[in-house]
Amino acid sequence: MIKTAVVILNWNGEAMLRQFLPSVIACSRLEGTEIYVADNASTDASCEVVEKEFPSVHLIRLDKNYGFADGYNYALQKIDAEYAVLLNSDVEVTEGWLQPMVDYLDTHPEAVACQPKIRAYRHRNLFEYAGASGGFIDRYGYPFCRGRVFESVEEDKGQYDEVIPVFWATGAALMIRLDVYRNVGGLDGRFFAHMEEIDLCWRLRSRGYQLVCIPSSTVYHVGGATLKKENPRKTFLNFRNNLLMLYKNLPEEELKPVMRVRTFLDYCAAVVWVLKGDFTNAKAVWNARREFFRIRSQFTANRQQNLAHTVLKTIPERYSFSLVWQAKVKGRKTFSALSH
């Protein structure tokens, strides 16, 4: 068994591999570390690029495009390691990025997963949308980060350099104990893409495991390389999967009241898009809710299993406020300004 497996999931990312794999190889020379590219049945020359240009990288060929969640699930079945790092193909890592995370997990057995600080690749002084300096969630399922609240991204001035527990760690650069990943069922493949890492992290936190952000490790993320922001497909997946995540994980006494408020908030979001003349994204919200109700029963067994294994009903990193109220109504656009 190796110590750390850095696993990059790829789909038609030939250009991204050429651009970012060199930094991963050069900066991941920690003893016991191996690098893998798991290819989701790309139709471009991705596999040939890995084999010919990066012979030190292990290539895992998947037979079809399984999406983010099952793509990683199937790839990780083929890897024997203590730690796995789920790393997006559009991430530039920095020298020594692995060491602080490995050291932390080695010395903190209560912690099962962590993420580095995520900065924006194109605006390198800013935090990056997908993970910034650690993820949190509000009462109604809205995710936010130290360094990012809705679309407002902060400049990194060292204000969030403390190692702290988080509710979720970004799937763009997620280090996790592989045995625990398997024990809790891994990523939910039915999500396909979006929200699946938050769902996984909720399962981990409710079982009493700790997740942290390690800001002394820094990477740079392009973001939006698969589905662009404001893409109706992305809107659909985000809204549908967020509802599924709530259904799977909310304590029984919270399920109905939270879902009632979410109905109101979701339709408010759709109305905002209509007022902007963006009818395709408004329709995506409607379709997401309709799809949620159509397939909800398929997740009932998962909900019962999650509740049966819950040891933390109240998770400190799941804040009791409404992020919509705090950010959209009160205008609080930074993590430190939110009323915790």
Predicted regions and their residues:
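Active-site-adjacent helix/loop segment of glycosyltransferases
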Residues: T4-V7, R207-Q304, H309-Y319, L323-V324
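Short, acidic, metal-binding catalytic loop of nucleotide-sugar glycosyltransferases
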Residues: P22-G32
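A conserved acidic beta->alpha catalytic loop
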Residues: S23, D39-E48, K64
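Short beta-strand/loop segment that forms part of the nucleotide-sugar
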Residues: G32-A41, I60-L62
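Glycine-rich, basic loop-to-helix element that forms the pyrophosphate-binding segment
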Residues: L62-I79, S89-V91, P100
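Short aromatic/hydrophobic "clamp" motif used to bind/position activated sugar donors
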Residues: A84
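Conserved donor NDP-sugar-binding/catalytic core segment of glycosyltransferases
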Residues: E92-Y142
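A short, conserved alpha-helix in the catalytic core of glycosyltransferases
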Residues: D161-T218
